[in-house]
Amino acid sequence: MDAMQKTIEYTSVSRIAGPLMVIDGIEGIAYGEIVDITTPNGDKRTGQVLEAREEIAVVQVFEGTSELNTSETKVRFTGDTAKIGVSYDMLGRIFNGAGKPLDGGPEIIAEKKLDINGYPLNPVSRNPPNAFVQTGISTIDGTNTLVRGQKIPIFSGSGLPHNKLATQIARQAKVRGEGEQFAVVFAAMGITGEESNYFMDEFKKTGALEKAVVFINLADDPAIERILTPRIALTTAEYLAYEKGMHVLVILTDLTNYCEALREIAAARNEVPGRRGYPGYMYTDLACLYERAGRVKGREGTVTQIPILTMPDDDITHPIPDLTGYITEGQIVLSRELNRKGIYPPVDILPSLSRLAGNGQGEGKTRDDHSKVISQAYAAYAEGRGLRDLVAVVGEEALTERDRSFLKFADAFENSIVTQGVDEDRSIEETLDYVWDLLTILPREELKRVSDELIEKYLPKK
């Protein structure tokens, strides 16, 4: 778009429907372009081009279309895409979903203005995810190890304590190493006012805000803002990682609300729906978010992602968790059964998986026994869980002494490894030591996945 076109104001709004308006008789307009809108009473609003064809543009109005009409509304196309001003001073601040301060502080003086959609990254310029990120939570650090540059979602359900877990991870997460800088970018989408107050209070009172940038989009905010929020958060993370050399953990919650916003906008545009009414491009859209995690050659910093989503009706085959699973490198699954038992965090390690766990385990990263002892504990816990079904049929008296030891191990594993205080920050060494303590419950001859050398070195003597 040339300078002349940027000054043209259009009054040719032909239709307004929901959050969308259609402008006729335009030319030289591009997809994603930002639009300045003047309402009939002179107020200013902002929009974005969602569709441009022939001489028609479909514009999503960020603040909604109330009070707009087809005769007096004025529109000016800016020629720019959606950008955010970023700065190191964003650390310790809370913003709304559009990047405006929510904490009463001043506007950020931008060091750079970056496109919120990021920039295409040549796969050849990526380094494989590597090195351990410690969350202080045993069921993540021990069994589903998080690695710098990885993307691993948390699959939750309505009413499960994923918000509490998200703030605990944000508070406790760290990288191990001298002089390594670490930050958290936290983005909440479509949350209630109560949840917003909870997040802000938790970040402020625990001191976690000092190393964090927080973005909050409320449920009554426009749907298009919900689409922008994770992109703004990821752009901020990329700036801190690749420009400032920091290791950044991005926590996105709740991606289900994000996908509902995608569906709402697609319906307003009369698009042909895909599975369960979601747009057919939802997979591509989610990939545009998740694939912004990683490590880049020649840059010190990394971007690691933990997206959190609530599975509708606890259905892991629902399109949102299903498509997420295709893109990401594993999943951490929260269990309603464990939650009913009063276990926090209710992480079910059997369906959970970190495909890159091996990249962050072992000597020089965690400890030399990590992968072997966790493999042994995982196998023993799985066998103990299976025996519970048998006990429900034949009773515990019918079990052999060996089977009873595995049953006891499964109960102890849930009570001492899975169960953890909301303020309990465990180092990986503490987690592994707890696991070795539990392995004393099993007969020595059943420890087939750990070497005699490791047993002599780490297994406590009875």
UniProtKB/Swiss-Prot annotation:
One matching Pfam family: ATP-synt_VA_C
Gene3D superfamilies with a match to the protein in the record: 3.40.50.12240
Family the UniProt entry places it in: Belongs to the ATPase alpha/beta chains family.
Matching SUPFAM superfamilies: C-terminal domain of alpha and beta subunits of F1 ATP synthase, P-loop containing nucleoside triphosphate hydrolases
Gene name as annotated: atpB
UniProt cross-references to PANTHER family, sorted A to Z: V-TYPE PROTON ATPASE SUBUNIT B (PTHR43389:SF4)
Topology with respect to the bilayer: Peripheral membrane protein
Subunit (UniProt): Has multiple subunits with at least A(3), B(3), C, D, E, F, H, I and proteolipid K(x).
General function of this protein: Component of the A-type ATP synthase that produces ATP from ADP in the presence of a proton gradient across the membrane. The B chain is a regulatory subunit.
Cited PROSITE patterns: ATPASE_ALPHA_BETA
Localisation per UniProt entry: Cell membrane
One GO CC term on file: plasma membrane
Positions of transmembrane segments: none
First and last residue of the signal peptide: none
Biological processes per GO annotation: proton motive force-driven plasma membrane ATP synthesis
Location (main, coarse): membrane
Name the record gives this protein: A-type ATP synthase subunit B
InterPro entries assigned: ATP-synt_VA_C (IPR055190), ATPase_a/bsu_AS (IPR020003), ATPase_F1/V1/A1_a/bsu_N (IPR004100), ATPase_F1/V1/A1_a/bsu_nucl-bd (IPR000194), P-loop_NTPase (IPR027417), V-ATPase_su_B/beta (IPR022879)
Single GO MF annotation: proton-transporting ATP synthase activity, rotational mechanism
Superkingdom of the source species: Archaea
Keywords per UniProt: ATP synthesis, Cell membrane, Hydrogen ion transport, Ion transport, Membrane, Transport
